[in-house]
Amino acid sequence: MNDKQKESSMIEGLKSYKRNIEAPWGLLFYRIIWDQLGQLKNKKILDYGSGFGVTANELAAQNDVTAIEPNKDMIKLRYKQNTYQQLVGTIESLKQEPNQKYDVIICHNVLEYVKDREALIAEFHRILKKDGFISIVKHNKLGKIMQKAVLEYKVEEVLTLLENRNVKSS
């Protein structure tokens, strides 16, 4: 596979992932997250690992949002109905930020891809205001299995996944 084919394949994969986000269960996930975050208004927010910018875009309606994402292809497909600052970057980008800059830091479905989690959390702590908070969401493999059963009605696929993982229900 040449570079152009690899890039095309990656873009198609990202488009498929974006369709999943826009499916009813993806929309439900985000509505639950936003409800748990509460009414944020006039806050300085960092969305680290912003992906397609779903959360950054939503929160930018009433807040000053900076989104950082390393994947340029995801940024090309991002949501941008509301105005927010989108940066291409990694933990190195955080090191350029001043101390205690953000009221809220969002880190959703990112930690599983970070090599040095301790360094990332230390940077979050440094740039978070004293009265601020961090919202962390991490993928849950068993949750994905339940999603297939409950939301996608793929019971046979779920049973196969459970058998292959030696997961038992009580």
Show the residue positions of the predicted features.
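A short acidic, Gly/Pro-enriched loop at the edge of an enzyme's catalytic core
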Residues: K95-I105
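A short glycine-rich, Lys/Arg-flanked "PGG" loop and its adjoining helix->strand segment in the class I
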Residues: E118-F133
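Conserved class I S-adenosyl-L-methionine
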Residues: M1-K41, K43-G51, V54-E58, M74-L77, F133-E163
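Class I SAM-dependent methyltransferase core
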Residues: D47, E69, E112
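Class I SAM-dependent methyltransferase SAM/SAH-binding core
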Residues: F52-S93
